[in-house]
Design a protein with these regions (language model features):
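Short, acidic, metal-binding catalytic loop of nucleotide-sugar glycosyltransferases
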Residues: 25-34
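A conserved acidic beta->alpha catalytic loop
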Residues: 26, 41-50, 97-98
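Short beta-strand-to-loop acidic/aromatic patch adjacent to the donor-nucleotide binding site
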Residues: 87-96
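A recurrent flexible, glycine/aromatic-enriched loop bordering the glycosyltransferase active site
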Residues: 147-166
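Conserved donor nucleotide-binding strand/loop of the catalytic core
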Residues: 53-73, 77, 81-84
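Non-catalytic, C-terminal membrane-associated alpha-helical segments of glycosyltransferases
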Residues: 247-297
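Conserved donor NDP-sugar-binding/catalytic core segment of glycosyltransferases
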Residues: 102-135
Length: 297
């Protein structure tokens, strides 16, 4: 049986110090006491490193990086660092994740009830207004979100890193997130990698608020112009994720990217050729992209 003292929360942060402060306060307020917290600072330039160096928080471990590894690289780095600390389980989250006080307690109860016979456990993610966060709805299949949050546990095949709990034995078996993804789809690829072989569950009693700065569906046709360039990672990484599903995965990719192209053409904000180029250049890059699965040393 695992208790909070066996768990390391891995928090990846980048230039969001006000949100990080709230995340750490929420972790300190957990009813399951004794949690270690490992913060990976992705070379922030907003005073995060200085803040962490002066923070007197029990169980806090900081890793200050000299370059931004992205969310994918940050979680891969943090999970390896957590393994070196000797923990039995990791609890992954972004710096804008605000766990409710009983979030970890509910995950630990589910772990005990299942006696560790699972791949990962995922929390219910809420928007600040209390509604379900659409960006973080788990998938019951590769193509459909779960139907709701009724019951003690819900089968799922993919989930985000907003609040993901897994044992270190699972990490040793299935490896680490693919750092080369940098951002986007690293969490879905990782959770799908595990769910192919082990049952995975959503635990509705474990609740977190995802205080996203840019809420909504990931789509270059809807997002703000300042974020368009980074979508090359999204369209590239999705190819790696879905091609493993065979013909159905390729059809899904082509249909999704074609639909996003149509939406861009309908968008009145302009720069349509640029955005369509990002979609299909990302797709082409994904066809050639063959990253290796990293494992703990």
């Amino acid at each position: 049986m695992i208790d909070a003292r066996d768990v390391t929360a891995v928090v990846v942060t980048y230039n969001r110090l006000p949100l990080l402060r709230r995340c750490l306060a929420a972790l300190q307020a957990q009813t399951a006491q004794g949690l270690r917290v490992l913060v990976v600072d992705n070379a922030s330039a907003d005073g995060t490193a200085e803040y962490l160096k002066t923070l007197a928080m029990p169980g806090l471990v900081c890793r200050i990086l000299t370059e931004n590894l992205g969310g994918a690289g940050g979680f891969a780095y943090g999970m390896q660092a957590a393994a070196e600390l000797g923990c039995k389980a990791v609890w992954l989250m972004d710096d804008d994740t605000l766990p409710e006080p009983q979030a970890l307690e509910a995950l630990l109860a589910a772990d005990a009830a299942m006696d560790g016979a699972y791949g990962w456990l995922s929390s219910r993610a809420l928007a600040p207004d209390g509604s379900d966060q659409p960006m973080n709805l788990q998938r019951k299949t590769m193509y459909r979100d779960i139907d709701g949050f009724d019951g003690k546990e819900i089968p799922a095949v993919m989930a985000s890193f907003v609040s993901l709990f897994l044992r270190m034995d699972t990490v040793r078996q299935f490896g680490l997130p693919i750092a080369e993804f940098f951002i986007w789809s690293d969490d879905w690829e990782y959770t799908r990698r595990i769910s192919r072989c082990k049952p995975c569950r959503v635990i509705p009693a474990s609740r977190v608020v995802h205080a996203m700065q840019n809420p909504g569906i990931v789509n270059i046709a809807r997002d703000v112009p300042e974020r368009w360039a980074r979508y090359r990672y999204f369209y590239r990484n999705d190819v790696v994720l879905y091609r493993r599903e065979g013909g159905a995965g390729w059809l899904w990719l082509l249909a999704k990217d074609a639909w996003h192209t149509v939406q861009v053409l309908r968008d009145s904000r302009g720069r349509r050729a640029e955005r369509i180029g990002i979609i299909w250049k990302g797709f082409a890059a994904g066809v050639k992209f063959r990253p290796q699965t990293p494992y703990l040393p």
